[in-house]
Structure formats: structure tokens, C-alpha cells
Amino acid sequence: MSRYRGPRLRIIRRLRNLPGLTNKLVESKKNKVSGSDQSIQKKVSQYCIRLEAKQRLRFNYGLTERQLLNYVRIARCAKGSTGQILLQLLEMRLDNILFRLGVVPTIPSARQLINHRHILVNNRIVDVPSFHCKPKDIITIGAPKTYQSILSKRIESFAKDQVPEHLTLSLSEPKKPKGLVNYLINRESIGLTINELLVVEYYSRKA
């Protein structure tokens, strides 16, 4: 299954707000239940609950079905909680790190910068959005002139205290902001409201 490129509002109306996909907020359709519909509401199956959790994770981080399945398999082979390791793997992707630093509004926009070779990790160009960042990695945003004004406005509007503790944003060079990965992210700093155990359960027969 390919990566979703359709209307984003349609997704967040169905799956609720996904900060990585879009910064727009809408009321979920599930919260808009008319009086006549309340009497005919069906009990949601456990499969549907797990499927929704999986879809929230996939769309928020902009993954294909195969990519997410591969991450689940990697998490299963690692020591520790499979669900937490899965979230850690997704959060430490380069495209998500840029998003969490606040230099881009969404993960898709971070992916665009990376694909155009404007991002350096430890002074080397990295053009792979799924690149796994590690503690002590230094990310430099070498944005083109056409994007610098947008970048400066974005950074001004993004409060520095919104940057999670596992990351540090340096603005000593406004035209080339830098990010530092302090340590691996912990569960409390995950930017998405999600029950990762439901995702692991969904893939229990596939991974």
C-alpha cells in the first residue's frame, strides 16, 4: 500500500487530530452523533479499535503499510516493551525530528526538505526521511533562500519551550538553525495521543 496523498482533513475527521499530518484541528465525526443515530449505534469491535489505532499511527508518521509492519517486526526483536520501542523508532526518524524541533509545520513538509537535500546530519547531507537519528546527532537545516523567510517566521511563532526535552534547538545562526538529539525519546515525550498496545495487538498475527 502506497503512502497516502489525498485530502488530509478527510483523514483527521475520521481518525481525530494527527499533529504530524496537519496542524489543522477538526471535530471528529464520531463526536457528532444525532439523536436518531444514538439509538442505532452499534458496539465497536475490538478489531475496529485496533485498526483505528494502527491507522492513526500510520497516517500521523506518514508511513506505508509495509513500512509500519517492518517497524513492528524490528520492535518485536528488540529487548523491552514492543509498543514503546515501536514509538521510539518512529519518533527518532529524521523527518519526525525536524517536525518536533518546530522548524517545519508537519512531517510531510519535513520530508520535502529532506528529499531536496537541504538537511545535514553531522555535516553530511541526508536525503532519506526514514534515517534513524541517534543521541549526539547534530541536524543542520540548510534551507534555500526561497524558504528562509518562511523558516524564520515559523521559528518565531514556535515557542522554544515546545521543543521536547530529548531535543535542543539552536538559533545561533538564524539562517542555519541546528538541532541536537540529547537522548532517546521516552514515552512521556511522544507527541501523539495513542495506545501503542492496540497497534501491537493488531499486528500480532502478521509480525
UniProtKB/Swiss-Prot annotation:
Q: Which Gene Ontology MF annotations are present?
A: rRNA binding; structural constituent of ribosome
| Annotated keywords | Chloroplast, Plastid, Ribonucleoprotein, Ribosomal protein, RNA-binding, rRNA-binding
What broad class describes the main subcellular location of this protein?
plastid
Q: Which Gene3D superfamilies match?
A: Ribosomal Protein S4 Delta 41, Chain A, domain 1 (1.10.1050.10), RNA-binding S4 domain (3.10.290.10)
Q: Tell me which residues make up the S4 RNA-binding domain.
A: 92-155
InterPro entries per record: Ribosomal_uS4 (IPR022801), Ribosomal_uS4_bac-type (IPR005709), Ribosomal_uS4_CS (IPR018079), Ribosomal_uS4_N (IPR001912), S4_RNA-bd (IPR002942), S4_RNA-bd_sf (IPR036986)
Q: Name one GO cellular component term.
A: small ribosomal subunit
Name where it's found.
Plastid, Chloroplast
Q: Which family does it belong to?
A: Belongs to the universal ribosomal protein uS4 family.
Assembly and partners are described as: Part of the 30S ribosomal subunit. Contacts protein S5. The interaction surface between S4 and S5 is involved in control of translational fidelity.
Q: What is the protein named?
A: Small ribosomal subunit protein uS4c
**Gene label:** rps4
